[in-house]
């Protein structure tokens, strides 16, 4: 199959408009690796947002209503101001304790006397 054989093929034009029912529209035209167009929609506040764009060797560039609208940004800022603030916590401080060295063992004579292993004494006697 020759899928995608003519991606940058001849010029094209297309568009659609859903009318008042959906509030969406789009128009695009392009040729040989470049495209230009626009789309629009009705946002949650009931405002029509329109974005114009171009795409080509320089990449994708959009202009128009590409950010958050002012009413939504203002409402979000008002809600953020009402949010409870976290209390400032003091930095944890490690308790200061004296350094006590561990007990050192005495590695001298054994606590219990034991005779030398007789086999070793007998072996040494044969030299």
From Swiss-Prot:
Record-linked PROSITE patterns: CHIT_BIND_RR_1 (PS00233), CHIT_BIND_RR_2 (PS51155)
Keyword Acyltransferase tagged: no
GO cellular component terms listed in the entry, alphabetical order: chitin-based extracellular matrix
Residue ranges annotated for the Chitin-binding type R&R domain, each copy included: 9-87
InterPro entries attached to this UniProt entry: CHIT_BIND_RR_consensus (IPR031311), Cuticle_Struct_Prot (IPR050468), Insect_cuticle (IPR000618)
Assigned keywords, A-Z: Cuticle
One Pfam assignment: Chitin_bind_4
A GO MF term: structural constituent of chitin-based larval cuticle
Purpose: Component of the rigid cuticle of the spider.
This protein's name: Adult-specific rigid cuticular protein 12.6
Organism: Araneus diadematus (European garden spider)
């Amino acid at each position: 199959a020759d899928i995608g054989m003519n991606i940058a093929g001849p010029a094209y034009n297309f568009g659609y408009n859903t009318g008042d029912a959906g509030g969406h529209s789009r128009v695009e035209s392009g040729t040989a690796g470049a495209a230009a167009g626009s789309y629009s929609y009705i946002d949650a506040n009931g405002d029509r947002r329109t974005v114009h764009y171009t795409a080509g060797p320089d990449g994708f560039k959009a202009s128009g209503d590409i950010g958050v609208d002012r009413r939504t940004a203002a409402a979000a800022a008002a809600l953020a101001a009402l949010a409870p603030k976290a209390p400032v916590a003091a930095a944890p401080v490690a308790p200061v304790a004296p350094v006590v060295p561990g007990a050192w063992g005495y590695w001298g004579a054994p606590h219990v006397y034991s005779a030398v292993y007789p086999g070793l004494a007998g072996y040494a006697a044969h030299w």
